[in-house]
């Protein structure tokens, strides 16, 4: 078997080397970009070499003809932070523009710390006078989403201080001391919005710091928490779609961070396969474009979820979809003026960003039948307070609602 794959590798390398020599001719740069996701000739050459190595690997188990359920009528989704808008009119304006652009889903946080604020079972917000129901803002968000015909993927995460119970040194985003408390919070949200919120995502990126706190990540513990919350949500609303946490694409195995592929397999080994309807991945392009076909456990790109799909099929989950919970390219200013994290997520121009994201939707329809909703990260910040952070430059709108090229491109895209 080893001899067989060696022969294939050598033959592939020879063939692609010849192809590369032929392709580096006038008029072929765009074709190569479409095949490799790289715009520069050096990157294209490396991509061709990596493609040869990919051909030498055993084929992935993708079950492309499997019947997928649940399916979505439209994959167009976007991440929102409507709870950060103080004025209800601004929430309404966001949802109006979201619907006008053809989006049919929002992925919206329902932060635990902002709902069950002071103590277990206490949904009164006393942080400012006068005290009021902590549900008020979220009731408004759900009602507005219904008015504009937009489905909600509710992110359930971010514990209040009381839920850490002596574990606060792990960080504000870390898991609660008692997983049953998280399940109770998920149940409270599901009970209040039964039949109105269509999907719930149980946590986010538990395979990396800081989302699992300042401690070693633990797929087995996350599986326990997931299964507890899944059971509670389904008991209240059997028709709700439950998403597992989106796993961050990483090759790290340091302990505080763990490869998404290893984390997912350990989730399955711990019995989590029965505790979600949809797997979730992050669809960031990072350092290459939307057509990058390279696949390696030791590299990250827009197609990395394909490796997760292989693990799902191997564990008997060919019928479940993957939703891309966050997807985009980082359109940073050309000169770094003190922006923290500059270049950590790659760098593209606003024009490239506006071209790449529509191409991602097109590729998903063409190549990835198991991919459902794709949620662009993100729609709009409430203010420009984070302009010194690289993550700010994933936005589609400025804080004053000025649309950027990505918004206009997606609005114009046939759907």
Regions found by a protein language model. Name each.
Residues 1-14:
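N-terminal Sec-pathway targeting helices
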Residues 5, 17, 26-69, 122, ...:
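Aromatic-rich peripheral "rim/lid" segments of glycoside hydrolase catalytic domains that contact
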Residues 21-105, 120-122, 128, 143-144, ...:
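N-terminal carbohydrate-binding accessory modules
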Residues 74-80, 106-108, 152-156, 200-202, ...:
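Hydrophobic faces of well-ordered beta-strands that scaffold small-molecule active sites
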Residues 85-99, 179-191, 257-269, 354-363:
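Short, acidic/polar
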Residues 98, 106, 145, 189, ...:
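Conserved, mostly hydrophobic/aromatic
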Residues 101-124, 128-256, 286, 332-334, ...:
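Substrate-binding cleft and catalytic face of glycoside hydrolase catalytic domains
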Residues 179, 183, 217-347, 395-396, ...:
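Noncatalytic carbohydrate-binding groove/subsite architecture in carbohydrate-active enzymes
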């Amino acid at each position: 078997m080893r001899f067989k794959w060696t022969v294939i590798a050598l033959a592939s390398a020879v063939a692609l080397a010849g192809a590369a020599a032929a392709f580096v001719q006038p008029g072929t740069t765009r074709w190569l970009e479409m095949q490799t996701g790289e715009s520069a000739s050096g990157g294209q050459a490396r991509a061709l070499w990596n493609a040869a190595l990919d051909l030498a690997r055993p084929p992935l188990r993708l079950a492309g003809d499997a019947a997928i359920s649940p399916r979505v009528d439209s994959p167009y989704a976007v991440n929102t932070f409507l709870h950060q808008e103080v004025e209800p009119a601004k929430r309404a304006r966001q949802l109006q523009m979201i619907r006008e652009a053809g989006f049919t889903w929002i992925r919206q946080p329902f932060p635990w710390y902002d709902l069950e604020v002071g103590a277990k079972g206490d949904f009164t917000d006393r942080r400012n006078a006068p005290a009021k129901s902590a549900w008020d803002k979220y009731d408004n968000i759900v009602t507005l989403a219904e008015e504009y015909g937009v489905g909600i993927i509710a992110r359930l995460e971010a514990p209040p201080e009381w839920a850490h119970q002596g574990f606060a040194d792990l960080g504000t985003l870390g898991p609660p001391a008692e997983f049953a408390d998280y399940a109770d919070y998920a149940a409270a949200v599901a009970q209040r919005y039964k039949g109105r919120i269509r999907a719930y995502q149980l946590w986010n990126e538990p395979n990396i710091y800081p989302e699992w706190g300042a401690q070693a990540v633990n797929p087995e513990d996350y599986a326990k928490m997931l299964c507890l919350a899944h059971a509670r949500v389904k008991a209240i609303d059997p028709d709700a779609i439950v998403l597992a946490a989106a796993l961050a694409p990483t090759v790290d195995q340091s302990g505080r961070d763990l490869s998404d592929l290893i984390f997912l397999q350990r989730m399955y080994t711990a019995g989590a396969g029965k505790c979600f309807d949809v797997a979730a991945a992050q669809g960031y392009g990072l350092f290459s474009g939307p057509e990058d076909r390279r696949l390696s456990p030791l590299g990250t790109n827009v197609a990395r979820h394909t490796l997760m799909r292989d693990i799902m099929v191997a564990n008997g989950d060919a019928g479940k979809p993957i939703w891309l919970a966050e997807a985009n390219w980082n359109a940073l200013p050309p000169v770094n003026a003190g922006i923290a994290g500059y270049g950590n997520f790659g760098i593209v121009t606003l024009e490239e960003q506006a071209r790449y994201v529509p191409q991602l939707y097109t590729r998903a329809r063409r190549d990835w039948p198991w991919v459902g909703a794709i949620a662009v990260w993100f729609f709009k910040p409430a203010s420009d307070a984070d302009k010194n952070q690289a993550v700010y430059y994933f936005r589609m709108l400025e804080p004053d609602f000025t649309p950027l090229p990505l918004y206009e491109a997606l609005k114009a895209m046939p759907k």
